[in-house]
Protein backbone atom coordinates (compact mmCIF):
# COMPACT_ATOMS: atom_id res chain seq x y z
CA UNK A 1 0.00 0.00 0.00
CA UNK A 2 2.89 2.38 0.74
CA UNK A 3 4.42 1.67 -2.68
CA UNK A 4 1.08 2.23 -4.41
CA UNK A 5 0.47 5.50 -2.59
CA UNK A 6 3.94 6.77 -3.50
CA UNK A 7 3.46 5.76 -7.13
CA UNK A 8 0.08 7.49 -7.48
CA UNK A 9 1.01 10.60 -5.47
CA UNK A 10 4.35 11.27 -7.17
CA UNK A 11 2.92 10.72 -10.65
CA UNK A 12 0.17 13.28 -10.08
CA UNK A 13 2.54 15.77 -8.43
CA UNK A 14 5.10 15.42 -11.23
CA UNK A 15 2.47 15.97 -13.92
CA UNK A 16 1.31 19.11 -12.11
CA UNK A 17 4.88 20.35 -11.65
CA UNK A 18 5.96 19.73 -15.26
CA UNK A 19 2.78 21.39 -16.57
CA UNK A 20 3.39 24.48 -14.41
CA UNK A 21 7.00 24.55 -15.59
CA UNK A 22 6.07 24.43 -19.27
CA UNK A 23 3.74 27.39 -18.94
CA UNK A 24 6.05 29.46 -16.77
CA UNK A 25 3.99 29.26 -13.59
CA UNK A 26 6.24 29.93 -10.57
CA UNK A 27 5.50 31.19 -7.09
CA UNK A 28 7.14 31.62 -3.71
CA UNK A 29 5.64 30.73 -0.35
CA UNK A 30 7.62 32.05 2.60
CA UNK A 31 11.19 30.99 1.73
CA UNK A 32 10.14 28.08 -0.50
CA UNK A 33 10.34 28.60 -4.27
CA UNK A 34 8.12 26.21 -6.18
CA UNK A 35 8.60 24.86 -9.70
CA UNK A 36 12.09 26.36 -10.13
CA UNK A 37 14.73 26.99 -7.46
CA UNK A 38 18.20 28.26 -8.35
CA UNK A 39 17.73 27.27 -11.99
CA UNK A 40 16.71 23.70 -11.08
CA UNK A 41 13.31 22.04 -11.30
CA UNK A 42 11.60 21.50 -7.93
CA UNK A 43 8.01 20.89 -9.02
CA UNK A 44 5.73 20.59 -6.00
CA UNK A 45 8.59 19.88 -3.58
CA UNK A 46 10.60 22.21 -1.37
CA UNK A 47 14.00 21.64 -3.01
CA UNK A 48 15.51 19.86 -6.03
CA UNK A 49 17.42 17.26 -3.98
CA UNK A 50 14.24 16.08 -2.29
CA UNK A 51 12.53 15.84 -5.69
CA UNK A 52 15.44 13.77 -7.01
CA UNK A 53 15.38 11.38 -4.07
CA UNK A 54 11.61 10.89 -4.18
CA UNK A 55 11.82 10.30 -7.94
CA UNK A 56 14.29 7.45 -7.36
CA UNK A 57 12.09 6.05 -4.57
CA UNK A 58 9.09 6.13 -6.91
CA UNK A 59 11.02 4.27 -9.62
CA UNK A 60 12.03 1.72 -6.97
CA UNK A 61 8.37 1.32 -5.94
CA UNK A 62 7.35 0.80 -9.58
CA UNK A 63 9.99 -1.90 -9.88
CA UNK A 64 8.60 -3.65 -6.80
CA UNK A 65 5.01 -3.43 -8.08
CA UNK A 66 6.06 -5.03 -11.36
CA UNK A 67 7.29 -8.19 -9.60
CA UNK A 68 4.80 -10.92 -10.49
CA UNK A 69 5.52 -13.38 -7.67
CA UNK A 70 5.34 -10.68 -5.02
CA UNK A 71 2.08 -9.23 -6.36
CA UNK A 72 0.47 -12.69 -6.58
CA UNK A 73 1.41 -13.40 -2.97
CA UNK A 74 -0.08 -10.08 -1.88
CA UNK A 75 -3.26 -10.72 -3.88
CA UNK A 76 -3.74 -14.04 -2.08
CA UNK A 77 -3.81 -12.25 1.27
CA UNK A 78 -5.50 -8.98 0.29
CA UNK A 79 -7.78 -9.39 -2.74
CA UNK A 80 -7.92 -6.06 -4.56
CA UNK A 81 -7.79 -4.75 -8.14
CA UNK A 82 -4.43 -4.94 -9.87
CA UNK A 83 -2.33 -1.96 -10.87
CA UNK A 84 -2.72 -0.69 -14.39
CA UNK A 85 0.44 -0.77 -16.48
CA UNK A 86 -0.46 2.74 -17.64
CA UNK A 87 0.12 4.01 -14.11
CA UNK A 88 3.45 2.20 -13.85
CA UNK A 89 4.65 3.58 -17.20
CA UNK A 90 3.44 7.09 -16.31
CA UNK A 91 5.18 6.90 -12.94
CA UNK A 92 8.46 5.73 -14.50
CA UNK A 93 8.37 8.37 -17.24
CA UNK A 94 7.46 11.37 -15.06
CA UNK A 95 9.87 10.48 -12.26
CA UNK A 96 12.76 9.77 -14.63
CA UNK A 97 12.09 13.12 -16.31
CA UNK A 98 11.91 14.92 -12.96
CA UNK A 99 15.17 13.28 -11.88
CA UNK A 100 16.85 14.66 -14.99
CA UNK A 101 15.46 18.20 -14.64
CA UNK A 102 16.20 18.57 -10.92
CA UNK A 103 19.92 18.05 -11.67
CA UNK A 104 20.59 16.30 -8.36
CA UNK A 105 23.95 14.56 -8.65
CA UNK A 106 23.50 12.57 -5.43
CA UNK A 107 20.09 11.26 -6.55
CA UNK A 108 21.55 10.28 -9.91
CA UNK A 109 24.24 8.33 -8.04
CA UNK A 110 21.46 6.61 -6.07
CA UNK A 111 19.59 5.66 -9.25
CA UNK A 112 22.72 4.38 -11.00
CA UNK A 113 23.82 2.51 -7.88
CA UNK A 114 20.44 0.80 -7.64
CA UNK A 115 20.53 -0.24 -11.30
CA UNK A 116 24.12 -1.51 -11.16
CA UNK A 117 23.69 -3.49 -7.91
CA UNK A 118 20.52 -5.10 -9.27
CA UNK A 119 22.35 -6.03 -12.48
CA UNK A 120 25.14 -7.57 -10.36
CA UNK A 121 22.56 -9.79 -8.69
CA UNK A 122 21.06 -10.79 -12.03
CA UNK A 123 24.53 -11.74 -13.29
CA UNK A 124 25.30 -13.97 -10.30
CA UNK A 125 21.81 -15.17 -9.32
CA UNK A 126 22.22 -18.41 -11.24
CA UNK A 127 25.18 -20.10 -9.56
CA UNK A 128 25.06 -23.27 -11.65
CA UNK A 129 28.12 -23.78 -13.82
CA UNK A 130 30.12 -20.89 -12.35
CA UNK A 131 33.88 -21.20 -12.80
CA UNK A 132 36.76 -18.78 -12.13
CA UNK A 133 36.97 -17.88 -15.82
CA UNK A 134 33.23 -17.19 -16.01
CA UNK A 135 33.38 -15.09 -12.85
CA UNK A 136 36.20 -12.97 -14.29
CA UNK A 137 34.27 -12.61 -17.54
CA UNK A 138 31.13 -11.51 -15.70
CA UNK A 139 33.04 -9.01 -13.56
CA UNK A 140 34.59 -7.51 -16.70
CA UNK A 141 31.18 -7.30 -18.35
CA UNK A 142 29.72 -5.67 -15.23
CA UNK A 143 32.48 -3.05 -15.22
CA UNK A 144 31.78 -2.21 -18.86
CA UNK A 145 28.03 -2.07 -18.20
CA UNK A 146 28.59 0.26 -15.25
CA UNK A 147 30.78 2.61 -17.28
CA UNK A 148 28.27 2.59 -20.13
CA UNK A 149 25.30 3.31 -17.84
CA UNK A 150 27.11 6.15 -16.08
CA UNK A 151 28.28 7.81 -19.30
CA UNK A 152 24.91 7.36 -20.99
CA UNK A 153 23.04 8.78 -18.00
CA UNK A 154 25.20 11.91 -17.85
CA UNK A 155 24.99 12.47 -21.60
CA UNK A 156 21.23 11.84 -21.70
CA UNK A 157 20.69 14.23 -18.78
CA UNK A 158 22.58 17.02 -20.53
CA UNK A 159 20.68 16.52 -23.80
CA UNK A 160 17.29 16.47 -22.06
CA UNK A 161 18.08 19.56 -20.00
CA UNK A 162 19.14 21.58 -23.04
CA UNK A 163 16.20 20.36 -25.13
CA UNK A 164 13.57 21.01 -22.49
CA UNK A 165 15.09 24.42 -21.77
CA UNK A 166 14.29 25.38 -25.37
CA UNK A 167 10.77 23.94 -25.04
CA UNK A 168 10.11 25.92 -21.86
CA UNK A 169 11.35 29.18 -23.42
CA UNK A 170 9.03 28.66 -26.41
CA UNK A 171 5.96 27.80 -24.35
CA UNK A 172 6.49 30.72 -21.98
CA UNK A 173 6.81 33.05 -24.99
CA UNK A 174 3.46 31.80 -26.28
CA UNK A 175 1.91 32.34 -22.86
CA UNK A 176 3.34 35.86 -22.74
CA UNK A 177 1.76 36.62 -26.11
CA UNK A 178 -1.58 35.28 -24.95
CA UNK A 179 -1.35 37.44 -21.85
CA UNK A 180 -0.97 40.51 -24.04
CA UNK A 181 2.70 41.37 -23.82
CA UNK A 182 3.91 43.50 -26.71
CA UNK A 183 6.28 42.21 -29.35
CA UNK A 184 8.98 44.62 -28.21
CA UNK A 185 8.97 42.99 -24.80
CA UNK A 186 9.47 39.56 -26.31
CA UNK A 187 12.09 40.27 -28.98
CA UNK A 188 15.66 41.00 -27.92
CA UNK A 189 16.35 43.58 -30.65
CA UNK A 190 16.71 47.03 -29.16
CA UNK A 191 17.50 45.78 -25.67
CA UNK A 192 20.48 47.13 -23.75
CA UNK A 193 23.37 44.77 -22.88
CA UNK A 194 22.24 44.81 -19.25
CA UNK A 195 18.70 43.77 -20.23
CA UNK A 196 20.01 40.99 -22.46
CA UNK A 197 22.24 39.73 -19.66
CA UNK A 198 19.25 39.73 -17.31
CA UNK A 199 17.24 37.71 -19.84
CA UNK A 200 20.03 35.17 -20.10
CA UNK A 201 20.25 34.92 -16.31
CA UNK A 202 16.49 34.38 -16.08
CA UNK A 203 16.60 31.59 -18.67
CA UNK A 204 15.99 28.17 -17.14
CA UNK A 205 18.70 25.67 -18.08
CA UNK A 206 18.08 23.04 -15.33
CA UNK A 207 21.72 22.95 -14.27
CA UNK A 208 23.53 24.00 -11.10
CA UNK A 209 24.30 27.70 -10.77
CA UNK A 210 27.34 26.51 -8.83
CA UNK A 211 29.45 24.79 -11.49
CA UNK A 212 31.54 22.85 -8.94
CA UNK A 213 30.55 19.21 -9.18
CA UNK A 214 30.86 18.86 -5.38
CA UNK A 215 28.37 21.74 -4.81
CA UNK A 216 30.37 23.01 -1.84
CA UNK A 217 30.69 19.62 -0.13
CA UNK A 218 34.49 19.62 -0.32
CA UNK A 219 34.61 22.66 1.95
CA UNK A 220 32.38 20.94 4.49
CA UNK A 221 34.43 17.75 4.44
CA UNK A 222 37.74 19.57 4.87
CA UNK A 223 36.26 21.55 7.74
CA UNK A 224 35.07 18.36 9.41
CA UNK A 225 38.70 17.21 9.79
CA UNK A 226 39.36 20.10 12.19
CA UNK A 227 36.20 19.26 14.15
CA UNK A 228 37.17 15.59 14.35
CA UNK A 229 40.57 16.51 15.82
CA UNK A 230 38.85 18.23 18.76
CA UNK A 231 37.56 14.92 20.14
CA UNK A 232 38.53 11.96 18.00
CA UNK A 233 37.63 9.24 20.54
CA UNK A 234 34.08 10.08 21.67
CA UNK A 235 33.20 12.86 19.20
CA UNK A 236 31.84 16.35 19.73
CA UNK A 237 28.10 15.44 19.56
CA UNK A 238 25.95 16.26 16.58
CA UNK A 239 24.37 19.28 18.22
CA UNK A 240 27.76 20.96 18.67
CA UNK A 241 28.93 20.84 15.05
CA UNK A 242 27.81 24.37 14.13
CA UNK A 243 28.72 25.75 17.58
CA UNK A 244 32.24 24.32 17.51
CA UNK A 245 32.68 25.45 13.94
CA UNK A 246 31.91 29.02 14.99
CA UNK A 247 34.32 28.81 17.91
CA UNK A 248 37.26 26.93 16.40
CA UNK A 249 36.96 27.26 12.62
CA UNK A 250 35.83 30.83 11.93
CA UNK A 251 32.22 29.71 11.48
CA UNK A 252 32.76 27.85 8.25
CA UNK A 253 29.65 25.74 8.93
CA UNK A 254 27.52 28.57 10.27
CA UNK A 255 24.85 28.40 7.57
CA UNK A 256 21.19 27.79 8.24
CA UNK A 257 20.81 25.30 5.41
CA UNK A 258 23.74 23.16 6.62
CA UNK A 259 22.22 22.84 10.10
CA UNK A 260 24.40 20.28 11.88
CA UNK A 261 25.18 17.90 9.07
CA UNK A 262 28.24 17.56 6.85
CA UNK A 263 26.44 16.25 3.74
CA UNK A 264 28.08 12.89 4.36
CA UNK A 265 26.27 10.48 6.63
CA UNK A 266 29.37 8.49 7.57
CA UNK A 267 31.46 11.60 8.22
CA UNK A 268 28.71 13.09 10.39
CA UNK A 269 28.65 9.93 12.53
CA UNK A 270 32.46 9.98 12.85
CA UNK A 271 32.61 13.64 13.91
CA UNK A 272 29.56 13.37 16.21
CA UNK A 273 30.35 10.09 18.02
CA UNK A 274 34.08 9.71 17.43
CA UNK A 275 35.93 6.53 16.62
CA UNK A 276 34.00 4.55 19.25
CA UNK A 277 30.57 5.39 17.86
CA UNK A 278 31.71 4.97 14.27
CA UNK A 279 33.17 1.52 14.96
CA UNK A 280 30.00 0.39 16.76
CA UNK A 281 27.83 1.61 13.89
CA UNK A 282 30.21 -0.05 11.42
CA UNK A 283 29.99 -3.40 13.23
CA UNK A 284 26.20 -3.25 13.20
CA UNK A 285 26.13 -2.32 9.52
CA UNK A 286 28.71 -4.93 8.51
CA UNK A 287 26.91 -7.77 10.28
CA UNK A 288 23.59 -6.83 8.74
CA UNK A 289 25.14 -6.44 5.28
CA UNK A 290 26.91 -9.80 5.59
CA UNK A 291 23.72 -11.57 6.61
CA UNK A 292 21.56 -9.98 3.93
CA UNK A 293 24.15 -10.69 1.21
CA UNK A 294 24.52 -14.33 2.28
CA UNK A 295 20.77 -14.73 2.29
CA UNK A 296 20.63 -13.33 -1.24
CA UNK A 297 23.56 -15.08 -2.91
CA UNK A 298 24.05 -18.32 -0.94
CA UNK A 299 20.52 -19.69 -1.08
CA UNK A 300 19.64 -22.58 -3.39
CA UNK A 301 16.65 -20.67 -4.76
CA UNK A 302 16.80 -17.38 -6.64
CA UNK A 303 14.67 -14.29 -6.16
CA UNK A 304 14.48 -13.05 -9.73
CA UNK A 305 10.72 -12.52 -9.52
CA UNK A 306 10.62 -11.35 -5.92
CA UNK A 307 11.27 -8.06 -4.12
CA UNK A 308 14.23 -9.04 -1.95
CA UNK A 309 16.86 -8.17 -4.62
CA UNK A 310 15.17 -4.77 -5.03
CA UNK A 311 15.38 -4.10 -1.29
CA UNK A 312 19.02 -5.21 -1.20
CA UNK A 313 19.98 -3.13 -4.24
CA UNK A 314 18.28 0.01 -2.90
CA UNK A 315 19.86 -0.33 0.54
CA UNK A 316 23.33 -0.84 -0.96
CA UNK A 317 22.86 2.11 -3.32
CA UNK A 318 21.66 4.26 -0.41
CA UNK A 319 24.94 3.66 1.41
CA UNK A 320 26.74 5.16 -1.59
CA UNK A 321 24.18 7.99 -1.67
CA UNK A 322 24.89 8.65 2.03
CA UNK A 323 28.43 9.70 1.11
CA UNK A 324 27.01 12.83 -0.53
CA UNK A 325 23.84 13.69 1.39
CA UNK A 326 22.35 14.22 4.84
CA UNK A 327 21.48 10.62 5.58
CA UNK A 328 21.70 7.58 7.89
CA UNK A 329 21.13 8.97 11.40
CA UNK A 330 20.85 12.53 12.56
CA UNK A 331 18.78 14.27 9.90
CA UNK A 332 15.12 13.46 10.62
CA UNK A 333 13.79 13.52 7.09
CA UNK A 334 11.99 11.39 4.53
CA UNK A 335 15.35 10.11 3.27
CA UNK A 336 16.49 8.75 6.64
CA UNK A 337 13.06 7.35 7.52
CA UNK A 338 12.92 5.54 4.18
CA UNK A 339 16.38 4.02 4.71
CA UNK A 340 15.46 2.51 8.08
CA UNK A 341 12.07 1.43 6.77
CA UNK A 342 13.70 -0.54 3.94
CA UNK A 343 16.18 -2.05 6.39
CA UNK A 344 13.27 -3.12 8.59
CA UNK A 345 11.50 -4.72 5.63
CA UNK A 346 14.68 -6.62 4.77
CA UNK A 347 15.00 -7.88 8.34
CA UNK A 348 11.39 -9.08 8.37
CA UNK A 349 11.83 -10.70 4.98
CA UNK A 350 14.92 -12.62 6.11
CA UNK A 351 13.37 -13.71 9.41
CA UNK A 352 10.17 -14.90 7.75
CA UNK A 353 11.49 -16.67 4.69
CA UNK A 354 14.84 -18.06 5.78
CA UNK A 355 14.18 -21.57 7.12
CA UNK A 356 17.08 -21.75 9.60
CA UNK A 357 16.91 -20.69 13.23
CA UNK A 358 20.32 -19.06 12.85
CA UNK A 359 18.79 -16.21 10.83
CA UNK A 360 17.32 -14.81 14.04
CA UNK A 361 20.81 -14.40 15.48
CA UNK A 362 22.55 -12.84 12.49
CA UNK A 363 25.02 -15.71 12.18
CA UNK A 364 25.73 -16.14 15.88
CA UNK A 365 26.72 -19.76 15.27
CA UNK A 366 28.36 -20.21 18.68
CA UNK A 367 25.36 -18.75 20.46
CA UNK A 368 23.05 -21.04 18.49
CA UNK A 369 25.07 -24.10 19.50
CA UNK A 370 25.04 -23.01 23.15
CA UNK A 371 21.26 -22.57 23.03
CA UNK A 372 20.86 -25.99 21.43
CA UNK A 373 23.04 -27.69 24.08
CA UNK A 374 21.12 -25.92 26.85
CA UNK A 375 17.81 -27.12 25.42
CA UNK A 376 19.14 -30.69 25.25
Spell out what each predicted region is.
Residues 124-125, 248-251, 273-316:
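Hydrophobic transmembrane alpha-helices and their immediate junctions
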Residues 71-84, 295-305, 357-376:
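Membrane-interfacial, low-structure loops and terminal tails that flank and connect transmembrane helices
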Residues 60, 111, 115-119, 284, ...:
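Transmembrane alpha-helices of multi-pass inner-membrane enzymes
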Residues 21, 122-208, 222-230, 238:
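A membrane-periplasm/extracellular boundary helix in multi-pass inner-membrane enzymes
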Residues 42-58, 239, 262-265, 270-274, ...:
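Membrane-interface micro-motifs in multi-pass membrane enzymes
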Residues 37, 206-273:
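Long extracytoplasmic/lumenal interhelical loops at the membrane interface
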Residues 3-31, 44-128, 291, 316:
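Alpha-helical transmembrane segments of multi-pass inner-membrane proteins
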Residues 30-46, 259-261:
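Active-site-proximal inter-transmembrane loops
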Amino acid sequence: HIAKFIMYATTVMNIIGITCLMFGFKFEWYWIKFTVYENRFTGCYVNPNLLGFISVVSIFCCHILSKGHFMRRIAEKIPEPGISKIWIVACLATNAFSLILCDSNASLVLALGYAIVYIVYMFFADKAGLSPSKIILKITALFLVGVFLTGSALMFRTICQEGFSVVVSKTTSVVDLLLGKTESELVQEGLTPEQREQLENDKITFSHENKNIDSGRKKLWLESINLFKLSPIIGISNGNIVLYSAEYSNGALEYSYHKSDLHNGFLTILVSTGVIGFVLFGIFGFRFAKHSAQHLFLQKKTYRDDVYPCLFAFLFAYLIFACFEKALLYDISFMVVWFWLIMGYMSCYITKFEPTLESQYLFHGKRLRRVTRTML
